[in-house]
Structures are given as C-alpha cells and as structure tokens.
Design a protein with these regions (language model features):
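Catalytic-domain carbohydrate-binding cleft regions of carbohydrate-active enzymes
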Residues: 1-225, 230-231, 265, 270-278
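Edge strands and adjacent loops of beta-rich recognition modules
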Residues: 237-280
C-alpha cells in the first residue's frame, strides 16, 4: 500500500475463465486499500507455449475470430479500470491489428476507446478524490449497498467511481471454440443478466431507460457495447475526445450529463495538467 503505485494481475493466459476470474480478483485487491489496479487486455499469453503458465487457448491469435471476441469483451471491461492498457506477448496489441474479416470487433473496440476518452473528466475527478479523500477507483457493490443481500453476492459487477455500474460480458456469444477452430453461433443470445441494487434507480447509459433498483433485468449486450448503468442522482462530466489524453483533458469542452430523479451535485476536480501543484 505504501509503495505499490500501480499494480496488475500478472501474466495471465487467454481464456474466458481467466477473464471471469479477473473481475473479483481486481475488486478484492482494491478493497484492501490499493486504488490503482489493472489487467493485461486480452491476457498476456495468447497461445499455448512450452511452459505450464504459457497456457492461452488461441494459437492463431488475431486471425482467430474467437479470440477477437474475447479480446473485445476484455477491452470493454478494461475501459472501466483505473489503468487502461493493452500488453502481452504472442501478437501485437495495437488496435488496428484486431480488424478481423469484417471489422465488427475493431469497431466495437474503437467505440469503447472513444468512451474512455469522453469520460476522462469523470475518471480524473475520481482520481482526485482518491488523493483528497482516500476514495476508491473501483469497488464491489457491497461497499455502497451493504444492506442489499443480493448485491453482497455479486462478483461480476462493480462501481467505477461513484456513479457508473459496470457489468462486463464474460461469456462467448458469437464464436465457440472447438477442435476444428472457431464455430460461428447462429442467432446468438445478446443479453446479460444484470442486478440493479436497491436503494436507488438506475439509467441504462446507452438508452437512458430508467429502472427501479432491487431487480434483475436482461440487459442488451451486443458486441458493440458493454452493459453500463448510471446511478440515479448522478452527474457525469464528459468531453469530446482528442488525439491524446492530455489534449482531451486540456480541451475545456465539458458537457455535464444529469441523471436526475432527485436533487444532485458533483464535485469536479481539474488542474493545469502538468506539474506537482496538485499536492498543495
């Protein structure tokens, strides 16, 4: 806690099971007092290698549409981590290497990347609250909804900052691995069961549909988006994305999106984007 500025989950191997395990691992880690944690998008090892730990399931890497689907879902999840990073071996991780045959997965990742940039004022403000108030970047639902018995059992949804509930997709929908390669699924299910904690209402980030808390819903989860919900009474500061994080933060073109069924307020943290003045 004193010296670990940024931690990550280690050199993981690509599989859906690994992705599922990463989410509670990160939440438990951050619950112990480390605000900055991340994972290698798409796992560090993609192929099967000579050693026991080199145990990825995708020898064809970016040529395998099944891996492109897994990588896309991993990418969408990591968009809502304190540190957003593609890193690993076996294949290059620049986004344009993941275009595939029809570009569907590539476009889904571009959309997630754009959203990360749009949310930088929110992310930066959350980081400011970590510094100022010992807040957390990500946290399990039990922290905010301790009296909701169902929320206490949820391990694959979490809060990113104080307003966003992230619900990663951790099951394949489009391609199934087999002994002969990737099999495209006919009429795939494109929904994910999501629990909306009681005590407040929730807005679907993509559609602005309002839901009462304390219920399970089937959330739309096509490949182009991750189920994402905004807590009632939230204000989200957003910006138009630019060519870099620095340019985006410094552009000054702020938009405040208000999700109001009741009075609400928001504390925006900003600075000049350079130097150590924030320490004072």
């Amino acid at each position: 806690q004193k010296y670990g500025a940024v931690m990550w989950s280690g050199d993981t191997a690509a599989s859906w099971e690994t992705l599922r395990r990463q989410i509670p691992a990160g939440l438990n880690f951050c619950a112990s007092g480390f605000p900055y944690w991340t994972a290698d998008i798409g796992a560090f090892f993609v192929k099967r290698g000579d050693y026991w730990y080199w145990d990825g399931e995708y020898d064809d890497t970016v040529e395998d549409p099944a891996y492109l689907e897994l990588y896309t879902r991993w990418y969408q999840w990591c968009c809502f981590l304190p540190i957003f990073r593609g890193h690993g071996t076996d294949c290059r991780r620049e986004l344009w290497n993941f275009k595939g045959a029809d570009g569907v997965f590539y476009q889904a990742m571009l959309r997630a990347n754009k959203l990360r940039y749009e949310l930088l004022p929110y992310i930066y403000s959350t980081a400011g609250k970590v510094w100022l108030y010992d807040a957390s970047m990500i946290r399990m639902l039990a922290f905010d909804f301790p009296k909701d018995a169902k929320a206490l059992e949820i391990t694959d949804q979490y809060l990113f900052g104080e307003s966003l509930m992230v619900c990663p997709v951790t099951e394949t929908m489009y391609y199934k691995k087999s002994a002969t390669g990737a099999e495209k699924q006919e009429n795939p299910s494109k929904v994910r069961n999501v629990y909306l904690p009681e005590g407040c209402g929730w807005y679907d980030f993509w559609t602005n549909t309002y839901y009462e808390g304390g219920q399970w819903i089937e959330a739309e989860a096509p490949i182009e988006r991750i189920p994402l919900f905004v807590k009632e009474g939230s204000i989200l500061p957003m910006q138009q994305p630019a060519n870099s994080t620095a340019e985006t933060v410094m552009s000054g073109n702020l938009t405040f999106v208000v999700y109001a069924q009741k009075d609400c307020s928001y504390e925006l943290y900003t600075d000049d984007g350079d130097g150590y003045a924030y320490e004072n």
